[in-house]
Each structure stands twice: as structure tokens, then as C-alpha cells.
Amino acid sequence: MNPDEYDLTDSDHQKAIWDLMMQPITVMDVGQTEHVYPTFTPGADKKPYEQNCAGELHGQSQGVHVLEEDTDGDGYVLIEAYANDGTKTDNEYMESRNAKKVQGYVKKSILFEVKPSDKYALLVDKLRQKLYIFEAGAIIGELDVSTGLNNAKQPYNESPAGEYITVSKVGDFNAGSGTIGRFAIRINGGTLLHEVLHDTAKDGTRIYTQYEAQLGMKASHGCIRIQRRANAQGQNMQWLWNNLENKTKVLIWDDQGRQMYEPELPDGGLQLYRNPKGGSNYHVDANCPGVKEKYLPLTGDFTYGDLEKDEFKKLTPCSACGAPVRPETLYERYVFEANQIGAEVTDEVKAKFGIE
């Protein structure tokens, strides 16, 4: 499917996406974290990787599409899917195939079909860095996410697109050095849906500041980080943990080859609040739960459109009450995503952000 052909605000388009997500998914009957290496020719050994191996796929949860059936009786079928991050040569990762659509042959005997849960379904849009929750043919909520971001040391962190099903609840995911992602749910080998990461203070306090600032842009090592702050419908990662059934379909839209979306800015008249006695944040709630009670209620003497004034230039958004990020941050994220997919930032978009 071409994501650019769908308008997520259109109820008919939502129903069409839901119908697609309710279709059975073909997966491979190996362990949830085991690898399958489709080869360019039927029955070939996967080594040497560069010559024989099309990529690395995962069992139980990752959907594959059968392109050619076993017509000659050799027991192999040609499949297509998005390669994962771990495909390794004898010496180095095959980063050129990370998150790329690949084709190769696998044994027909390992393929089986799964009917997804019809309670909910999830759509992750890598271009917009949003997760959309579907129920009964309609979107019932959306959440901010961070998908995988390649870097110089790890040029294989991109979150593969494609279709998946949830297969197990992992719980707390330890990213190392006391950094935790709660409520982790496995959807593709080592790729998890989990709450936005937090560091842990000596007294056990969870510190989300660094990672919540990255929501809405690529930042992870491949997992899908999801907001912890509940949206207007009361949904967040914990809600997903509590409500998703096993075998929930997860559709991930790629960003490559897409048209850039029209960026949205918060209303300039949005009322904001602050602590004029030294607070460093701006807030959307006069009684923000992240502020000590002795400073409440906060002072509401400016709006989102006033953030460029000298008096408010140094204020940063409060993650506890979900204050929107500054316009310059939104623009930086937009430019970053445009560069990721080779798209041009138009003069109209620049004008919208006041960029000359």
C-alpha cells in the first residue's frame, strides 16, 4: 500500500486501512527471537552472506508476502519482507539492507497464517512519528513515538516497515546503565513497543526529560518508543499494555519515497503558564503535576505565540503536562525528516515558521 494515498482524517480511508489490517498475516514458525535468512537461490547456504543472503527476518511476528509458490516441488517459496538490523557478514553488518524490502527463498514448511485480533490494531507512521490506535474501523487515538535512528557507529538502527503482530509481553526493557523502557511488547524479534525511556535516580525517581524531548522524531535503536503521558482519550503506552490482545496487528509505514506532510503549528493563542520566580519551563496546565505545590497555581501571562519574545526565549516545554515544543524545534524536526527521505523544504513551509 502507498501511505500517501490515504488521508487519516477521512473515515472511509480509516475503514479501508482497518480492513487491510484485519487480513491474515503469514509468519515463520521459528522462535520469536530466532532469525530466518532468505537466500537468493532455493536451498542455498546463507554464507557467504554478501553473495547468498537476502537479509535477516524474525519468526512468529514478522509478516512476509509469498511472491512465488513452490511450483517445482523443491519445498521453497519466494517471499518478500523488510530486512532487520542484524544481518551480518563474517566481519560487519550489512547495513545497506537494514529496513530495505528484500526478496529471497525460504522453506515453505516454516510458513503459517495467523488471524489477527479484531479488538484493536496499530498503525505507526515513520514519516510523522505517530502511532494511531484503530478500533472497529476507525482511529480512536494517536500517540507520539520515536522510531529507529541510524548513527555513525550503528548504521543499522532503522525500524523496518511492514506488518507485524504482537507476540509477547516483555515488561521492563533494560537499555543499559539504568535506562528502562516500561511495558515492552514484542513485535519483531528484538524490536519492541515500549514506553519512552527513563533514567533512574538513586532514590528510584524516573527521569524522562532527555527521552521525552525526542518524541516526534527518530531516536531509538530500532524499538518504537511511545509516550507515557496520557492523551485526551486516556491512552498511552500503559494503556496499550493493558488493552492490547496477543496477535494485535501492527502496521508500520515507511518514510522513504513519501511526500512531506504539511507541518502543523500549535495555535498562537494557546494559553501558557510559568513560574515567574525562576521556573525554567512553560506549561499548558496552571496546576501542572510536575511542579511543586507551593508554586501553584502558575501564572498565565503569555501564549504560545509569545515564545519568541525576549522574556520567554529561554523557557523550555514541560513534559509533565505535555506542553508543545517550541516552533524552532518543530522546524528542526521537519527539516531532519525531510533530509532523511531526500525531500525539499518548500518556501511555503519556511514562511510558516518565519524562516527567511
Map each language-model feature to its residues.
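Gly/Pro-biased beta-strand-loop elements
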Residues: E92, A99-R206
